[in-house]
Regions:
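Residues that form generic nucleotide/phosphate-binding pockets
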Residues: 58, 81, 91-99, 151-154
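N-terminal helicase ATP-binding lobe
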Residues: 7, 84, 89, 97-105, ...
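Conserved P-loop NTPase motor cores
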Residues: 1-91
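Generic recognition of flexible, low-complexity loop/linker segments
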Residues: 22-24, 53-54, 91-95, 99-107, ...
Length: 157
């Protein structure tokens, strides 16, 4: 079971946190594997501390975790559920920077963290950074910036 954009589910009704919690606890009994995907730890901060604790438990109970770039102010929230070394935190923050503009061509450069992730197994093992390299076909299928690129091209014309 894959729950991408988990923040949307939690915003639809924070009480769904109880259903998701049950799934994370009973998934093996049901013969399910699961992947929960969201953007930031702030997505797991709900209207009450009790609901927020339940949501943070999703991460606490995950034996394998993948992180992309995160803002520096996310580190404190993340460390409430997972210890990170200073190097791991610095790397995640570095990856969150926006892309620059090439001064010679005026072209936008990709952000430094595009396709970069860190895998954490358990709590004490060091994070393993890696880069995803998409094929041309995968890039076309998963390009979420297409509308933005087209709008920028129209603006330049």
């Amino acid at each position: 079971m894959i729950m991408d954009e988990l923040w949307q589910t939690l915003r639809a009704s924070e009480l769904l946190v109880h259903q998701i919690d049950a799934l994370t606890r009973l998934n093996r009994q049901k013969g399910l594997g699961q992947i929960l995907i969201t953007h930031t730890m702030k997505d797991l901060t709900l209207s009450t501390e009790q609901l927020s604790e339940i949501a943070r438990g999703f991460l606490e109970r995950s034996s394998v975790k993948y992180f992309g770039g995160l803002a520096r102010n996310e580190m404190e929230l993340l460390e409430q559920v997972l210890p990170l070394s200073q190097r791991e935190k610095d790397l995640l923050v570095e990856w969150s920077a926006e892309g620059a503009t090439d001064p010679r061509t005026g072209q936008s450069l990709p952000p430094p963290g595009r396709g970069r992730f860190m895998m954490k197994l358990g709590e004490n093992a060091p994070g393993v950074p890696f880069k995803m390299n998409l094929t041309d076909t995968e890039h076309r299928i998963h390009d979420t910036n297409e509308a933005w690129v087209e709008a920028m091209a129209r603006a330049r014309a």
